Amino acid sequence: MLSSSSLYAAIDLGSNSFHMLVTRETAGSIQTLAKIKRKVRLAAGLDKQNRLSQEAMQRGWQCLQLFSERLQDIPQDQVRVVATATLRLATNADEFLQRAQEILGLPIQVISGEEEARLIYQGVAHTTGGPDARLVVDIGGGSTELATGIGAKTTQLISLPMGCVTWLDRYFSDRNLEAGNFERAENAAREMLRPVAASLREQGWQICVGASGTVQALQEIMVAQGMDEYITLPKLRQLKEHAIQCDKLEELEIDGLTLERALVFPSGLAILLAIFQELDIKTMTLAGGALREGLVYGMLHLPVDQDIRHRTLATLQRRYLLDTEQAKRVSTLADNFLQQVARDWQLDSRCRELLRSACMVHEIGLSIDFRQSPQHAAYLIRHSDLPGFTPAQKKLLATLLQNQINPIDLMPLSQQNALPVNQAQHLCRLLRLAIIFASRRRDDTLPAVRLRVEGEALRLILPAGWLAQHPLRAEMLEQESRWQSYVHWPLMLEEAPA
């Protein structure tokens, strides 16, 4: 039974939506128990004098009535409620906040834009893998936050008064998706970014992470259309052209774009186009968490792990009682194989990390049943919360585990979008071989195997006499050679001269 003392909640009164995150602390991380979101569009209720309309406030209060029931089970000192851009701006914010605090029975903190950027950065730092030096971008309903940092430490925090709701009302109020509206929206956003662009570019970040509904929508679109998960300027421009062809906001249809996100998608897209151009961003990926996760981790006072993915994999190993020594054995072998073929097969550090991750949890399916354990492993990975891994990376891990033994199914390898198909196939081949060679579960039985690449053909060179001395693994390798040949992956076995 869950103890209420292990429960934490964070509420974000945003300009477009109100969100509540309910979690519990587990093994130095947080486990999500509930996410509740209601489209309140508070910013749309601001008039020219920045007064909130009664209708907008009523929408907000009704939403908080829903939230308040869930909060009754959580200690008050383990709940944080913050308000952002619209309530920073509204001249009658006190009227809204007084009633809101009565409904929740909790204080509500109207945070500054810089504090919002800091919390967003912390949420990303605790949940998102990749290089330590990062730029974080969050396009909200009424403001856009930009934060740079290294590890857990922020180096620059910026909040700009432009958001997908305010830009919708300002530049797409006629509901026309014409090129002129996009141009005006982009130019206005670029103008707002110019005073801070140079200093942001100088921070030396290695990775750009997006933590907003706009970026989430883009990720869903790209997955639905079979693209890889990396957001780039050409992809954004392609989507803009598609939107322009739709002519009207009500007629906007893009594969993967949900009706819920469609209304503010063009305005968010215009802002993101401006950010990419002004900051010279090459690629962006989706964050694993943002403001609400930052609030929860702040209450827990947990340090930011140097390697979030390692923490996630270690948590899975403990939860499912995996043999960590065997995982390490397979990982070491697979890494050795990868380094031998990396140049010929163009396998970079990203491939190396994903292969290592698959090795660390390759036996997770055994926790359900030996029979069909690869399918069980794929299911568990596909449906687990894996901080540090993007949705596309989760899908690739599941696909690799599904294909770790037995006949090879090429379809899921071609349908994943974390890596080019040929790289994913090469990782699959190396994982399968490492599992075979490590099958006796002892370090002293691992042979010194040399790998030679000849196009797509892979030649394994074993110590003299090894195949005769190890008949079971020799038979497994012969079977593996046949299975790989069925999918046109030539695999040859030979022994070095005595």
Curated annotation (Swiss-Prot):
Q: What is its EC number?
A: 3.6.1.40
Keyword annotations from UniProtKB, A to Z: Hydrolase
Q: Which residues form a coiled coil?
A: none
Q: CDD domains in the record, alphabetically?
A: ASKHA_NBD_EcGppA-like
Q: Which GO terms describe its molecular function?
A: exopolyphosphatase activity; guanosine-5'-triphosphate,3'-diphosphate diphosphatase activity
One example of a Gene Ontology biological process annotation: guanosine tetraphosphate biosynthetic process
Q: In which pathway does it act?
A: Purine metabolism; ppGpp biosynthesis; ppGpp from GTP: step 2/2
Fetch the InterPro entries from UniProt.
ATPase_NBD, Exopolyphosphatase, GppA/Ppx_hydrolase, Guo-5TP_3DP_PyrP, Ppx_GppA_C, Ppx_GppA_N, PyroPPase_GppA_Ppx
User: For this protein, what reaction is catalysed?
Assistant: guanosine 3'-diphosphate 5'-triphosphate + H2O = guanosine 3',5'-bis(diphosphate) + phosphate + H(+)
Give the family from UniProt.
Answer: Belongs to the GppA/Ppx family. GppA subfamily.
NCBIfam families reported for this sequence: exo_poly_only (TIGR03706), PRK11031.1 (NF008260)
Its biological purpose is as follows: Catalyzes the conversion of pppGpp to ppGpp. Guanosine pentaphosphate (pppGpp) is a cytoplasmic signaling molecule which together with ppGpp controls the 'stringent response', an adaptive process that allows bacteria to respond to amino acid starvation, resulting in the coordinated regulation of numerous cellular activities.
> Can you name this protein?
Guanosine-5'-triphosphate,3'-diphosphate pyrophosphatase
Tell me the organism: Pectobacterium atrosepticum (strain SCRI 1043 / ATCC BAA-672)
